[in-house]
């Protein structure tokens, strides 16, 4: 059985003091969660948040990383740095990174391989735009992004990868793919992983849905056969809302 994973991506919100307050509120509300709980604060919050979540069931994620261990890469953060401050998961290839910062499939792949080689679990984001969806290209786009991201990932490592299907048109818009639609895409993703790594490995890979996930729609999403959790945006900035999602 795949253990569900619910992760809150705070994006560019929360100063360190606000971050501490948020996790302190969250801890008692999610202590009995059956799902794996991950918070993904901005880089400057990670150390403070890590101190507060020690000894709890909350795990730490980062929003991005560079693929080199060190060097003259001004403004970048390396996997070694993240590892040392207690990070377990790293979001890679979020549509906002692709859209605003020119992140390509090739860059995403380099980051995925680097994360895995340093013992970090990548949460690899894939998803189609509204125009791609309207042109009937959802499956083509999403499956291709996935194949590109996983190039060179070993059979042993694939089980440490989490995939997040985030249709771009649903992020922050209030629009959500129907649970059935999301499940169809996620099923196709799992079949693609099976074609690359075999059915047994594919059955162990967790695939989340992301895109306007909120307390009102989480149980419907989680009732589907292949949806293994959620990558939550705005709703993860309010402890009580995120807790309701985690405790679906």
From Swiss-Prot:
PROSITE patterns per record: TIM_1, TIM_2
InterPro entries named among the record's database cross-references: Aldolase_TIM, TIM_sf, TrioseP_Isoase_bac/euk, Triosephosphate_isomerase, Triosephosphate_isomerase_AS
Active site location: 94 (electrophile), 166 (proton acceptor)
Localization in the cell: Cytoplasm
GO CC terms in record: cytosol
Domain of life: Bacteria
Record GO terms (molecular function): triose-phosphate isomerase activity
Catalytic activity as recorded in UniProt: D-glyceraldehyde 3-phosphate = dihydroxyacetone phosphate
Class of the enzyme per the UniProt entry, highest EC level: isomerase
Main location: cytoplasm
Keyword match Cytoplasm: yes
CDD domains hit by this protein: TIM
Keyword Secreted: no
Quaternary structure (record): Homodimer.
Function in brief: Involved in the gluconeogenesis. Catalyzes stereospecifically the conversion of dihydroxyacetone phosphate (DHAP) to D-glyceraldehyde-3-phosphate (G3P).
Family statement: Belongs to the triosephosphate isomerase family.
NCBIfam families noted in UniProt: tim (TIGR00419)
Protein name in UniProt: Triosephosphate isomerase
